[in-house]
């Protein structure tokens, strides 16, 4: 099973990614160990804090490879973030994990308790538009039947093998284009979702998760929407970073004037 998760997702370099069950809420090194087991797929019996795995973690959060796992790093690890395990490569996916077409349908299957359906629809529309604005991709919403990208809200265990963990943990996850469930995007229904700066802004998290569903890995650039942890940006002024644009255009190409309606 291939998947991408946002604690608000993480991909292996060959575009294989699966979400991981939540870790216990430990402090200090116990938490770091749990984090590594979750997001770097280390074996329980293997040495944990090897130089290689520590370097991976530091690179994931765009920090100098000589830094120590200090209080600032511990704080970063406790931020709500994507729950998909990451490999050592956070650059452009060498496998070019992508859809083989430019017109994609999407469907919102259900809604959270704390947002009006119209606000959810606007947030998802704006999220897909962020990606279509810089690529030849065209997104069309459908109300019924199958769709390429399927958006839904769930809580705890929800029959995909990757349960959510309640408020403040994993915010969402998404399956990759070449997975057994391409385009599936799940959000944790236990989170407080909004169209503003209260709780978690659905537009921002959806932009991240849909990026994964299009084939993007996480970025180590903190200005990127594909950065592993959730950071609030004003949706009214939000723009993709140069890193985001470069990587999505690497998969789908640039938007030509003929692509503009």
From Swiss-Prot:
<dbReference type="Pfam" id="PF00413">
    <property type="entry name" value="Peptidase_M10"/>
</dbReference>
<dbReference type="GO" id="GO:0031012">
    <property type="term" value="C:extracellular matrix"/>
</dbReference>
<feature type="active site">
    <location>
        <position position="209"/>
    </location>
</feature>
<keyword id="KW-0272">Extracellular matrix</keyword>
<feature type="glycosylation site" description="N-linked (GlcNAc...) asparagine">
    <location>
        <position position="64"/>
    </location>
</feature>
<keyword id="KW-0862">Zinc</keyword>
<keyword id="KW-0177">Collagen degradation</keyword>
<feature type="signal peptide">
    <location>
        <begin position="1"/>
        <end position="17"/>
    </location>
</feature>
<keyword id="KW-0482">Metalloprotease</keyword>
<feature type="glycosylation site" description="N-linked (GlcNAc...) asparagine">
    <location>
        <position position="221"/>
    </location>
</feature>
<keyword id="KW-0645">Protease</keyword>
<dbReference type="GO" id="GO:0050728">
    <property type="term" value="P:negative regulation of inflammatory response"/>
</dbReference>
<protein>
    <recommendedName>
        <fullName>Matrix metalloproteinase-26</fullName>
        <ecNumber>3.4.24.-</ecNumber>
    </recommendedName>
</protein>
<dbReference type="GO" id="GO:0006508">
    <property type="term" value="P:proteolysis"/>
</dbReference>
<feature type="propeptide">
    <location>
        <begin position="18"/>
        <end position="89"/>
    </location>
</feature>
<keyword id="KW-0732">Signal</keyword>
<dbReference type="InterPro" id="IPR006026">
    <property type="entry name" value="Peptidase_Metallo"/>
</dbReference>
<feature type="binding site" description="in inhibited form">
    <location>
        <position position="82"/>
    </location>
    <ligand>
        <name>Zn(2+)</name>
    </ligand>
</feature>
<feature type="binding site">
    <location>
        <position position="208"/>
    </location>
    <ligand>
        <name>Zn(2+)</name>
    </ligand>
</feature>
<keyword id="KW-0378">Hydrolase</keyword>
<dbReference type="InterPro" id="IPR024079">
    <property type="entry name" value="MetalloPept_cat_dom_sf"/>
</dbReference>
<dbReference type="GO" id="GO:0030198">
    <property type="term" value="P:extracellular matrix organization"/>
</dbReference>
<dbReference type="GO" id="GO:0005615">
    <property type="term" value="C:extracellular space"/>
</dbReference>
<dbReference type="InterPro" id="IPR001818">
    <property type="entry name" value="Pept_M10_metallopeptidase"/>
</dbReference>
<feature type="short sequence motif" description="Cysteine switch">
    <location>
        <begin position="80"/>
        <end position="87"/>
    </location>
</feature>
<dbReference type="GO" id="GO:0004222">
    <property type="term" value="F:metalloendopeptidase activity"/>
</dbReference>
<dbReference type="GO" id="GO:0030574">
    <property type="term" value="P:collagen catabolic process"/>
</dbReference>
<keyword id="KW-0106">Calcium</keyword>
<keyword id="KW-0479">Metal-binding</keyword>
<keyword id="KW-0865">Zymogen</keyword>
<dbReference type="InterPro" id="IPR021190">
    <property type="entry name" value="Pept_M10A"/>
</dbReference>
<keyword id="KW-0325">Glycoprotein</keyword>
<dbReference type="GO" id="GO:0008270">
    <property type="term" value="F:zinc ion binding"/>
</dbReference>
<comment type="similarity">
    <text>Belongs to the peptidase M10A family.</text>
</comment>
<feature type="binding site">
    <location>
        <position position="218"/>
    </location>
    <ligand>
        <name>Zn(2+)</name>
    </ligand>
</feature>
<keyword id="KW-0964">Secreted</keyword>
<comment type="function">
    <text>May hydrolyze collagen type IV, fibronectin, fibrinogen, beta-casein, type I gelatin and alpha-1 proteinase inhibitor. Is also able to activate progelatinase B.</text>
</comment>
<dbReference type="InterPro" id="IPR033739">
    <property type="entry name" value="M10A_MMP"/>
</dbReference>
<feature type="binding site">
    <location>
        <position position="212"/>
    </location>
    <ligand>
        <name>Zn(2+)</name>
    </ligand>
</feature>
């Amino acid at each position: 099973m291939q998947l991408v998760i946002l604690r608000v997702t993480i991909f292996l370099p060959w575009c294989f990614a699966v979400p991981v069950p939540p870790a216990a809420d430990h402090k200090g090194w116990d938490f770091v160990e749990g984090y590594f087991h979750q997001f770097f797929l280390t074996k329980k019996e293997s040495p944990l804090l090897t130089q290689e795995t520590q370097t991976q973690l530091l690179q994931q959060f765009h920090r100098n490879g000589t830094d120590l796992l200090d209080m600032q790093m511990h704080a970063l690890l406790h931020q709500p973030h994507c729950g998909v395990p990451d490999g050592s490569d956070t650059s452009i996916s060498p496998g070019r994990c992508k859809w083989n077409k430019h017109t994609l349908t999407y469907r919102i299957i259900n809604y959270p308790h704390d947002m009006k359906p119209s606000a959810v629809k606007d947030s998802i529309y704006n999220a897909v538009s962020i990606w279509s604005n810089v690529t030849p991709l065209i997104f069309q919403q459908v109300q019924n039947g199958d769709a390429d990208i399927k958006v839904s809200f769930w809580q705890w265990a929800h029959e995909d093998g990757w349960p959510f963990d309640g408020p403040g943990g994993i915010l969402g996850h998404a399956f990759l284009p070449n997975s057994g469930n391409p385009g599936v995007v799940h959000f944790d229904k236990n989170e407080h979702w909004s169209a503003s700066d209260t709780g978690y802004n659905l537009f921002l998290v959806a932009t991240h998760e849909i990026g994964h569903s299009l084939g993007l890995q996480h970025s180590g650039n903190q200005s990127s929407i594909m950065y592993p942890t959730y950071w609030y940006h004003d949706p009214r002024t939000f723009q993709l970073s140069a890193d985001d644009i470069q990587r999505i255009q690497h998969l789908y190409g640039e938007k030509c004037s003929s692509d503009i309606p």
